Amino acid sequence: MSRFRIPGAGRLSPARPLRFTFDGRTYSGLEGDTLASALIANGVHLVGRSFKYHRPRGFLSAGAEEPSALVGIRRDATRQTPNVRATVQELYDGLAAISQNRWPALSFDVGAVNDLAAPLFSAGFYYKTFMWPRKAWKYLYEPAIRASAGLGVAPKEADPDRYAARFAHCDVLVVGGGAAGLSAALAAAESGASVVLADEQAEFGGSLRFESGAVIDGRLGWDWAQGAAARLAAMPNVRLLTRTTAFGYYTQNILGLAERLTDHLAAPDPAAPRERLWQIRAKRVVLATGAIERHMVFPGNDRPGVMLASAGRTWLNHHGAAVGSAVGVFAANDSGWLAALDLAKAGVRVAAIVDTRPAAGEEVTQAARAAGIEVLTGHTVTRTDGRLRIGSMTVRPVSGGGSARRIAVDALLMSAGWTPSLHLFSQSRGKVAFDEATQRFLPGQYAQDCACVGACNGTESLAAAVAEGFAAGEAAGREARKGLAKSPPPLTPPHKGEGDSAAPTTPSPLWGGVRGGGIAASGGGRPPAVDASEPCSGGALGDAAGGVKGRAFVDFQNDVTSKDIRQAVREGMRSIEHVKRFTTNGMATDQGKTSNLHGLAIAAQALGKPIPQVGLTTFRPPYTPVTFGTIVGHARGPLFDPTRRTTTHAWATRHGAVFEDVGQWKRAWYFPRAGEDMHAAVARECRTVRQAAGVFDASTLGKIEVVGPDAAAFMELIYTNPWQKLEPGRCRYGLMLREDGFIYDDGVVGRLAEDRFHVTTTTGGAARVLNQMEDYLQTEFPHLKVWLTSVSEQWAVIAVQGPKSRDIIAPLVEGIDVSDAAMPHMSVREGTICGVPTRLFRMSFTGERGFEINVPADYGEAVWEAVWAEAQKHGACAYGTEAMHVLRAEKGYIIVGQETDGTVTPDDVGLAWAIGKGK
């Protein structure tokens, strides 16, 4: 048993031990541990170094918001993942983790010299330092800064793992599997709706993981959660996704989710995907994403062993591990007191509870005194001491000028309240609203079909969260199923029992602050008075009494202090986005989950403005880091860019063609005979086309059908040429320009009927021309009745060019007179060739007589074989793209993208004649 593992505490079984290593040293853990909880159980708090100053860092949280405990995970030489949050990584037997951003060792890091040079690296230092001598930047400063940048080391080997992707749709998607989320999923599922419930943890339960006294429906909260999950798993209309993070909320209720499939396994199946990307469209979304506990901002708050109260409770109540043997608690709300009571109940000595408020809740105060815990209300922590882990804290009264007192501790739990997790809500384009009474942002105006429930909605009690989740789930399910099925009977929501904790899920902290300090929460319904000119005013946190000073950290990973944020304001930053970039607050891998609101409050205080007027930084996806492999999926290596082949590719291969890449297409470049190099082969092909005939695969050209009563009017608006008077059965060269008048694309257009055009584009322009047509049709000309359909891959195109081209195709076509009188140049006819339906174009890209045979792609190779057999009778040859380029250049025909570069007008290339006189 690890020395900080408490027998009988937690929910893990000691009968399932696991072995793992951290920085080469072997430790033991239990099945169900995270790497963080296992290290805590072994008394290990130092796990990393901060980004800028290389200060010792421990754990701050027990969840995805963790900014400090980033490690590298190594399975083998090819499987190394940097910047993994130890609080999320599940333990497995043989796990090997290494600390990051240190040299030569974690306990002795040469980079810590940066901490001594901290004045050189203050906020915005990159704008103000390393400016002299000028040449030193290129040869000294920049190389040194770049060499020291970053945290983990990216793997150098190719990723050997597989990744998967799935698309899904459902009536109701519930994000978050805590009490509110489970309740919402149950209600929605029982209404008959199809439901997807996703949670980033390995098990459902959310905050019930650490709420030891919660009771729902007469059962302990955690037991109720597992029972609810089992009920949902048994329902055919429910899909449960654990270890799945909803990282992005996009338009039309599409959410991106990353499911971790094998990172928790000791020996994963090499054929199984490591992660899966889900893209889910839901009729209704219920966000039950919870809240993130706020840390206190005071000097020395970054020392290993100083952590959030919820982290200490999670590791104690779920994993059975104590964070120390003499634990201090620093709080501004009752959540910290609950952590102290849980520790005391488990037999861990609580050195003291320090609370900035004049008084805490009566129930928790009485319980603390009954447990023999020293209570110091109206006090604050002014500093901590200890080299690689906290060894003591110094406290003093908030006001009244009392003397400072030093208390020995080996861990310090802190809690300044809770911040609703609104990242996904904001990504959905929802507008947040600032609640003055509780000094926090809450969901305001909704932009999509979603609802926020529980702690992320600011709901403060477990009972209210369960009821709110149930109501939202039932409403979402009924609305999504409206008119599709018989309405189910009224549902009965879960009932919260009497054993639940009395503390609200989301307390109501209020901000305060002074010179050099940060943020404190205070009771009383309104913020304390603040006098920024005095170091000890209003119960705020700042410089310690007696002139002792220290740095109070806001962003633990990027080493941003409260002083840095005030400095940014002094140097002219007024927008919170400017403050963010000047200080790098909230720009670390955690994207400011624990630091954004603190930085905002300090900046608002420095500016003398209310928090809402300063603004809120933009929440962008992903919510937490997502591996490149998850995003890329199968699209790598040969599958990164699809290789497209025409129907004659196999034939060309058999006949010795040399291929070239044209966009995604493999095209026959030339057909060398024995002893020929490219120049000889191309010269022969060109000569044969001029003297007899040649057969060429032109299937890669883009093909778009423009159909509808307004098709001709639409063509007039898209192309420079006139189209209204073009008769069915005739073709015309079409020129398309950008809005600035430069050439965009070209091609031959055949009018098949009054309301139907067969449009060809360049090979490279097929997709972009269709997109531009669609864009204009939907935004500029929505009144036109026109339908656009890409048929590029539906038609194989065989070009027969040369003086004998008519002799080659005449015996093969049925129902089409190919004489000059019946089918003049620039004509199109429909009939059959070799019994296959065809659109036959009389056109040329060589200057010789030519025909282009369009047949359904499935028949392309068969028709080609028939044409080739006939062509050989007339001395024709197959030719490739190189000969095509020579032949068209000899006649002065342009290719968009070769004779044009985006700055060429029609007149520049002799195409002024293609512009209609009335345009």
Name every feature range the model reports, one short phrase each.
Residues 198, 291, 683-699, 743-756, ...:
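Residues forming anionic-ligand binding surfaces in small-molecule and nucleic-acid pockets
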Residues 724-755, 760-772, 776:
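Well-ordered mid-protein domain cores that form the structural environment of catalytic cofactors
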Residues 649, 653-654, 667, 753-755, ...:
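Conserved, structured C-terminal
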Residues 37-47, 704, 709-726, 807, ...:
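A short, contiguous, amphipathic alpha-helix enriched in charged residues
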Residues 1-487, 502, 520-643, 794:
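Residues forming the flavin
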Residues 598, 606-737, 742:
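Acidic, proline/glycine-enriched N-terminal capping motif
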Residues 493, 497-498, 511-516:
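Glycine-biased, low-complexity coil/linker segments
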